[in-house]
Structures are given as structure tokens and as C-alpha cells.
């Protein structure tokens, strides 16, 4: 049973987050190990395994990057944990320039405004990549979607770096 089947959801990138959460809570209740305290050793072990499977599946499906990676793996393209290097020099150059720009923001005269504008630009880029990934997955364009997910991981890492700069600047 795959993660989507476990939650009774269609195997697609676009998910109803509230439905996923409610299904998760329902499955958690149903298979909580405490409910099997008086059951046989085998049934208790199965309940623990099922609870772990539910938690793992939820973690994968609630995150758009891991959900896209999972959909790709379900369609024969395994990119989770891969060490493949990015093959798009223009994208890599853009990422380097963005990181350099982020490094300079704290030294500018209006760091708060500059960081907010930079964050908005990167967030827009992130959302555009998500929309493209959704379309590519819907159209079964697996290699293109895989490349886009690789790029999205770079952008997500940049978003995390923005948060770190924000914490340093504003506590």
C-alpha cells in the first residue's frame, strides 16, 4: 500500500492539506499502540509498525518536495538522497548570485526592507517552481519534474538561509 492509498487520497501532487491532516489524525487514533495494549504480542507489534508507517507517510505527503520525490519514485524515478549534480549552469549561476546578494543584505543601510524584498522574490520563485512541478507531474513528464524538484531544493535551502539571516538581524 502506497502513502496515498494509506490516506485514501488520489496519487497526485496537489493535495487538500486539511483532508490529509484529518485522515492522519483518524489513522493515528485507530492504530495507536495504546489501543492494542491487551492484544497479542504480534498484534501489538503490527500496531507499532502501522503507526510508524502512518507517521512516515504523513511526513512525506505534507511536504511538497518530499511529496514530489515520492510521486517520482512511484513512477520509476528515484531522486531522494541522490548525489547527482545539477546540470543547469544558468540556474547554478543564478543561485550563486542570489546567495551573494543575501550575504550583502545585513551590511546594507536598510537591511529589513532589503531582506523583505529578497524574501518576496525568492518566495515567488519557489511558488512558480511548485506550479511547474505540479503541471509536469500531472502531464507525466517525469524527467522534467525531477530536474525541477532538484532546483526547488536549492530554492528551499535559500529560503532557509533567509530565515537564518532574519534571525541574526532581528533576533
Swiss-Prot record:
Q: Check the record and name the SMART domains matching this protein.
A: DnaJ
Which SUPFAM superfamilies does this entry report, sorted A to Z?
Chaperone J-domain, HSC20 (HSCB), C-terminal oligomerisation domain
Q: Which InterPro entries match?
A: DnaJ_domain (IPR001623), HscB (IPR004640), HscB_C_sf (IPR036386), HscB_oligo_C (IPR009073), J_dom_sf (IPR036869)
Q: Please name the GO terms of the biological process aspect recorded for this protein, alphabetically.
A: [2Fe-2S] cluster assembly; protein complex oligomerization; protein folding
UniProt keywords (A-Z) are: Chaperone
Q: Name one GO molecular function term.
A: protein-folding chaperone binding
Does this UniProt record's set of keywords contain Chaperone?
Answer: yes
Establish whether keyword Chaperone is in the entry: yes
Instruction: Give residue ranges for domain J.
Output: 2-74
The UniProt entry, under Gene3D superfamilies, shows: DnaJ domain (1.10.287.110), HscB, C-terminal domain (1.20.1280.20)
Its GO CC terms are:
iron-sulfur cluster transfer complex
Assembly behavior: Interacts with HscA and stimulates its ATPase activity.
> Of which family is this protein a member?
Belongs to the HscB family.
Task: Output the HAMAP family linked to this UniProt entry.
Answer: HscB
Tell me the function of this protein.
Answer: Co-chaperone involved in the maturation of iron-sulfur cluster-containing proteins. Seems to help targeting proteins to be folded toward HscA.
Q: What is this protein called?
A: Co-chaperone protein HscB homolog
Amino acid at each position: 500500500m502506497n502513502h496515498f492509498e494509506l490516506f485514501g487520497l488520489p496519487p497526485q501532487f496537489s493535495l487538500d492539506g486539511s483532508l490529509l491532516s484529518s485522515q492522519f489524525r483518524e489513522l493515528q487514533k485507530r492504530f495507536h499502540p495504546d489501543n492494542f495494549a491487551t492484544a497479542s504480542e504480534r498484534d501489538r507489534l503490527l500496531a507499532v509498525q502501522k503507526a510508524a508507517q502512518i507517521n512516515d507517510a504523513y511526513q512525506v505527503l505534507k511536504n511538497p518536495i518530499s511529496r514530489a520525490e515520492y510521486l517520482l519514485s512511484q513512477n520509476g524515478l528515484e531522486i531522494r538522497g541522490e548525489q547527482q549534480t545539477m546540470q543547469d549552469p544558468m540556474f547554478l549561476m543564478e543561485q550563486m548570485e542570489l546567495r551573494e546578494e543575501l550575504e550583502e543584505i545585513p551590511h546594507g543601510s536598510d537591511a529589513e526592507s532589503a531582506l523583505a524584498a529578497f524574501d518576496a522574490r525568492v518566495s515567488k520563485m519557489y511558488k512558480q517552481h511548485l506550479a511547474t512541478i505540479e503541471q509536469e507531474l500531472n502531464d507525466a513528464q517525469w524527467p522534467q519534474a525531477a530536474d525541477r524538484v532538484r532546483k526547488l531544493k536549492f530554492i528551499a535551502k535559500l529560503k532557509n538561509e533567509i530565515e537564518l539571516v532574519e534571525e541574526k538581524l532581528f533576533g
